[in-house]
């Protein structure tokens, strides 16, 4: 979906997402970890996720497990200051919702106080109690099933899920239990397209796919992946629409070359003294005290 930057954008709401699901309108979601990314993405997307993926995308970690609530608060506040029109969702990081309802509510409520419209948490049946506790406190919850990065050690790596009868049917059961617990949407990650399609058609709430085929109610990719800003292995489900890493390096290389050959800064990038001061500055001589 594309918007005109010249017209005020109507805020995206949770009821609007449900209406779009009912009408077959696809949802566009991406991540933002700072104000710059939020300002770039907001006129274009429907949902901005301040994801715990900030850990491996921006902070140099191998996975999302080291990301703390304090780290998430820092990045959420940066994005929230841009006052996006998009629905702003904050990830509940590892151990922020595993330690009891009271702490879960406190952590999630803190995200809403800092500008989030909703929170996202990973997991199926084991998270039902936490989802209900949050929804009972009027904290909107987006669920996340399939390849859940916080469970990477249990899963034995970043592997496609739902490829056996037991795991596929369990995912469908979990999806419906999360819907019944009050989730307003579900992220489906790293599962076969047919399984995601079955979940989407059987649920009343929207599904947002990432590596889950084309039949979900919407799609999400990491901002840096779409723009080609990440190095190394690229998951099969990622489509980069430009090579941002190379483009940025080329721009920096041109700038560095201009500095080294004396072409930057040019006259247009320099400030000038008023004519009446140039003579005084040019003829200034250090006094004996300043030359010591």
From Swiss-Prot:
Known EC number: 2.1.2.11
Pathway(s) served: Cofactor biosynthesis; (R)-pantothenate biosynthesis; (R)-pantoate from 3-methyl-2-oxobutanoate: step 1/2
Keyword Metal-binding found: yes
Positions with a binding annotation for 3-methyl-2-oxobutanoate: 52-53, 91, 120
Catalysed conversion reaction: 3-methyl-2-oxobutanoate + (6R)-5,10-methylene-5,6,7,8-tetrahydrofolate + H2O = 2-dehydropantoate + (6S)-5,6,7,8-tetrahydrofolate
Keyword check for Metal-binding: yes
Predominant localisation class: cytoplasm
Gene Ontology biological-process annotations: pantothenate biosynthetic process
Cofactor descriptive note: Binds 1 Mg(2+) ion per subunit.
Assigned keywords, A-Z: Cytoplasm, Magnesium, Metal-binding, Pantothenate biosynthesis, Transferase
Active site per database record: 189
GO MF terms held by the record: 3-methyl-2-oxobutanoate hydroxymethyltransferase activity; magnesium ion binding
GO cellular component, one term: cytoplasm
Function field: Catalyzes the reversible reaction in which hydroxymethyl group from 5,10-methylenetetrahydrofolate is transferred onto alpha-ketoisovalerate to form ketopantoate.
Subunit structure: Homodecamer; pentamer of dimers.
Protein name: 3-methyl-2-oxobutanoate hydroxymethyltransferase 2
Protein source organism: Bradyrhizobium diazoefficiens (strain JCM 10833 / BCRC 13528 / IAM 13628 / NBRC 14792 / USDA 110)
């Amino acid at each position: 979906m594309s918007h005109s930057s010249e017209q005020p954008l109507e805020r995206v709401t949770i009821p609007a997402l449900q209406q779009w699901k009912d009408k077959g309108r696809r949802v566009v979601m991406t991540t933002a970890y700072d104000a710059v990314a939020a300002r770039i993405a907001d006129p274009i997307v429907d949902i901005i996720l301040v994801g715990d993926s900030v850990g491996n995308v921006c902070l140099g970690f191998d996975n999302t497990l080291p990301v703390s609530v304090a780290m998430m608060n820092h990045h959420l506040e940066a994005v929230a200051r841009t006052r996006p029109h998009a629905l702003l969702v904050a990830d509940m990081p590892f151990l922020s919702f595993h330690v009891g309802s009271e702490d879960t509510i406190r952590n999630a409520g803190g995200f809403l106080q800092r500008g989030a419209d909703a929170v996202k948490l990973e997991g199926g049946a084991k998270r039902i109690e936490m989802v209900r506790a949050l929804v009972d406190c009027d904290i909107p919850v987006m669920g996340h099933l399939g390849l859940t990065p916080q469970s990477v050690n249990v899963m034995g790596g970043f592997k496609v899920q739902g490829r056996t009868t037991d795991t596929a049917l369990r995912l469908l059961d979990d999806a419906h239990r999360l819907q019944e617990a009050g989730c307003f949407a579900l992220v489906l990650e790293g599962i076969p397209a047919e399984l995601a399609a079955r979940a989407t058609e059987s649920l009343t709430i929207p599904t947002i796919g990432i590596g889950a085929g084309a039949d979900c109610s919407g799609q999400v990719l990491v901002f840096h992946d779409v723009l080609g800003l990440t190095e190394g292995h690229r998951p099969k489900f990622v489509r980069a629409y430009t090579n941002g890493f190379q483009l940025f390096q080329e721009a920096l290389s041109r700038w560095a070359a201009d500095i080294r050959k004396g072409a930057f800064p040019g006259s247009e990038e320099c400030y000038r003294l008023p004519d009446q001061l140039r003579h005084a500055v040019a003829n200034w001589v250090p006094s004996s005290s300043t030359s010591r």
